[in-house]
């Protein structure tokens, strides 16, 4: 047993230090990034925010809506091949180019991904997603998927330390998904005692990935636009959002009415709700590691994503970053014990 003494930080522990800027308006900030991926050699241009691969967030409808903003969607893995075929026929090229096809690591899921990717040349991104990315099985699965799809962009996770980021990139992942336990409906840290404060995880994993020419997705922990900016400032190439994009008409969640008001069900993918729906209940050998909440119905996602991106633009003007690419170079975080004034409630 050993104890690491170095303090690790989450988004609530820091604020950006403002810096002198020549920017006159938020409209001057360029949020589009241009990426070339290490293994596939593919190029992509867009706003590097991703809707999380949860079935109460990342629907086909969400993918179409977010693509209008140049934003990506990791479509959840519970659609059938037939549903994907219909989506491939009806969606436009921009939407298809901005979706990840999500998968677990079983043999059946591998066969399913092969069928989905064969539906359209426009499917470029694969998201290999398991809760515990420290499994040797994940590394082997990444190698297998890379051998099958040498020209596709592969994301794999989730992990929170540089050593595992490096191993996954060397195994064939272009992007590594970073985050264990920070999500709004995740209870892994409570049920298991395992986790890592998200900002420190992003800083350390980003450093490891960039040293090998790979990239990272900061997955989870964002509760406001400022947190999204902090993730980018800490070195995340992409930021993945679940709860911030849940509860919308495009989210795909179940609508519930209580006291004359509409709510949408939102749950973690290791929650009792998810396992009841997709696995016939919680297996005897495991515990649910997520919760189910009812969110007030929020209407269309367009206003929400515009508000998030507007917040990131504003961050850039405060620190003098004309492009999102420059944000991490212009970032100085200060450690704090307060964030916002809550006299009149939370924003």
Curated annotation (Swiss-Prot):
Gene3D superfamilies: Aldolase class I. One of its GO terms (cellular component) is cytosol. CDD domains: IMPDH (cd00381). NADP(+) binds at residues 108-131, 216-239. One of its GO terms (molecular function) is GMP reductase activity. InterPro entries: Aldolase_TIM (IPR013785), GMP_reductase (IPR050139), GMPR (IPR005993), IMP_DH/GMP_Rdtase_CS (IPR015875), IMP_DH_GMPRt (IPR001093). GO terms for biological process: purine nucleotide metabolic process. It is an enzyme of class 1 (oxidoreductase). Coiled coil: none annotated. K(+) binds at residues 181, 183. Keywords: Metal-binding, NADP, Oxidoreductase, Potassium. The active site is at residue 186. Its EC number is 1.7.1.7. It catalyses: IMP + NH4(+) + NADP(+) = GMP + NADPH + 2 H(+). Catalyzes the irreversible NADPH-dependent deamination of GMP to IMP. It functions in the conversion of nucleobase, nucleoside and nucleotide derivatives of G to A nucleotides, and in maintaining the intracellular balance of A and G nucleotides. Belongs to the IMPDH/GMPR family. GuaC type 1 subfamily. Homotetramer. This is GMP reductase. It comes from Vibrio atlanticus (strain LGP32). The gene is guaC.
């Amino acid at each position: 047993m050993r104890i690491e003494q170095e303090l690790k930080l989450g988004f609530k522990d820091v604020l950006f230090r403002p810096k002198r800027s020549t920017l006159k308006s938020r409209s001057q900030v360029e949020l589009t990034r241009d990426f070339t991926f290490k293994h596939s050699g593919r190029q992509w241009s867009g706003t590097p925010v991703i809707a999380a691969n949860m079935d109460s967030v990342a629907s086909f409808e969400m993918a179409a809506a977010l693509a209008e903003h140049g934003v990506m969607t990791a479509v959840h893995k519970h659609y059938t091949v037939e549903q994907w075929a219909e989506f491939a026929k009806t969606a436009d090229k921009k939407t298809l180019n901005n979706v990840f096809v999500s998968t677990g690591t079983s043999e059946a899921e591998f066969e399913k991904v092969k069928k989905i990717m064969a539906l359209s040349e426009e499917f470029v991104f694969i998201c290999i997603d398991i809760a515990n990315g420290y499994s040797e099985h994940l590394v082997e699965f990444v190698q297998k998927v890379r051998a099958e799809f040498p020209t596709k962009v592969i994301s794999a996770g989730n992990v929170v330390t540089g050593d595992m980021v490096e191993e996954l990139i060397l195994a064939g992942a272009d992007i590594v998904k970073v985050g264990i336990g920070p999500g709004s409906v995740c209870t892994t840290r409570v049920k298991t005692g395992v986790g890592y404060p998200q900002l420190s995880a992003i800083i350390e994993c980003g450093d490891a990935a960039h040293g090998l020419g790979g990239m990272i997705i900061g997955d989870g922990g964002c509760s406001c636009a400022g947190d999204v900016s902090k993730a980018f400032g800490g070195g995340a190439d992409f930021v993945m959002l679940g709860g911030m994009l849940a509860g919308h008409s495009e989210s795909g969640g179940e609508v519930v009415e209580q006291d004359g008001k509409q709510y949408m069900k939102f749950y973690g993918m290791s929650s009792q709700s998810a396992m009841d729906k997709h696995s016939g209940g919680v297996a005897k050998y495991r515990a649910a590691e997520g919760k189910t909440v009812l969110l007030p119905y929020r209407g269309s996602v367009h206003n929400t994503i515009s508000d998030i991106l507007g917040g990131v633009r504003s961050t850039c003007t405060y620190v003098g970053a004309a492009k999102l690419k420059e944000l991490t170079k212009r970032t100085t975080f200060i450690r704090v014990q307060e964030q916002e004034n809550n006299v009149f409630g939370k924003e």
